[in-house]
Amino acid sequence: QQVEAFSKPWKIKNWGGPAMNPGLREQWQGKSKVLVTHPKSEEIPCVLSAEIRVPATQSPKLVLAVSNHPKGDWVLAVKIDGKSSLVQKVDQSKWQHIQLDLSDYSGRKINIELENRANNWSFEAGYWGEISIRRD
């Protein structure tokens, strides 16, 4: 429910880290309505997934705003139809704005998975300020 309140049509699996109190935050680092996730274990990432129809426009993009807990970091992995499209460490303790070109999938229905992977297993919470598809 909290994921849908944050951003439909995203679903979540392998939500862990009760000590990090995952869920929806009213505000974090100047953004409102922020989703906090945490990997289930060092080996099992928390996964946000959705089936999306990519707009048939010139340069559709997956747009993310992600951050980390000030005492930790995590690894963001993006998979499209099961294929790795991005692996990036999130460790700046500020919002990182990421745009992933979806032009190759224009007009198609795709499955996107956003993984919150562990990195050294210390304060691995992922903070999501935006997950959207833009039609630029």
Task: Identify the role of each PLM range.
Residues 1-136:
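Gly-Asp-aromatic-enriched flexible segments
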